[in-house]
Amino acid sequence: MRFMDTTIDLRCAKRNMLIIILVIAASLLVNISANAQNAEQWKTLEGDVNLFIANDLGRNGYYEQKPVAELMGEMAGAIGPEAIVAAGDVHHFEGVASTQDHLWMTNYELIYAHPELMMTWLPVLGNHEYRGNTQAVLDYRNISRRWEMEGRFYTKVYDDNGVSIRLVLIDTTPLIDRYHHSATYPDVDSQDIDTQLKWIDKTLDEAKEDWVIVVGHHPMYADTKKDIIEQKDMQSRLLPIFQRHKSKVAMYVCGHIHNFQHIRRGNDGIDYVVNTSGSLARKVNPTDGTVFCSPAEGFSVVSASKNQLNLYMIDNKGNVIHKIERFKK
């Protein structure tokens, strides 16, 4: 009869287990060190007033949505933003049916669950929200304390350490003709375009803050395979207003195209920024006026001091891949 040497087997098992534990411990130490290093680097982005901008999110956590959400939470811990500006399409693909739609959990609550993301969110409507019940998107502020959407278009001022930023948050889908008279976008036709445009003009006219940023979902300028008529409609309705207030408007920031683009056109001095998707990005090529473009997923960080406004484009690894700087003259 053959007997196995169990003593040797136990020694081997213990040794293997020790190796595994040491490897795991070393990996954790590397991750902790890397996170600490990242936090120190991210801290340098902080200004007197800080904001995150994220959009084109709702993929039920798939693709890069969950990793980017976790990254946002980690960076928020280092930078301490006052709010997260959600520049449309928090929900793909057909919007939401009600405030109780399960998509609120799978697209938003369970994804952006990091403790540092339990702060004010300032959303605007995107074209995908308009495929569903847009009033439910507004009414969700009665369900979630962090969903501070005051209207289809509204303004918000942040003032800290003597530095002020005015956000002018607008509803761009009704400004584009192709969304009208369509059963796919049932709430568009009931929106009063003229009322919104007059409100934007008046709000910019009365703005006295150090910095003014206009945020909408659709781009004024962009490289895209989408119908160029979208940009032409935006330009015909908004550019005259922006031109009247070009001394005040620092940036127009949007989403919709699912990549990063920084564009300067004409002599109005405004930076036109396309913020990428926080879940699934698309290819991009330079176009007329392109300063920078990238197909990376991610989000943007805005930081302001009295004399300087910065927008940092952050990829899905937490790297700053482009910086827009504006200075007070």
Description of each model-found segment:
Residues 34-102, 223:
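N-terminal active-site segment of His-dependent metallophosphoesterases
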Residues 43-45, 50, 92-211, 227-251, ...:
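Extended active-site neighborhood of metal-dependent phosphoesterases/phosphodiesterases
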Residues 55-56, 88-89, 170, 216, ...:
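Active-site flanking residues adjacent to catalytic metal/cofactor-binding acidic residues
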Residues 1-14:
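N-terminal secretory signal peptides that target proteins for export/translocation
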Residues 19-29:
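Bacterial N-terminal signal peptides
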Residues 53, 86, 265, 304-309, ...:
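Generic beta-strand structural signal
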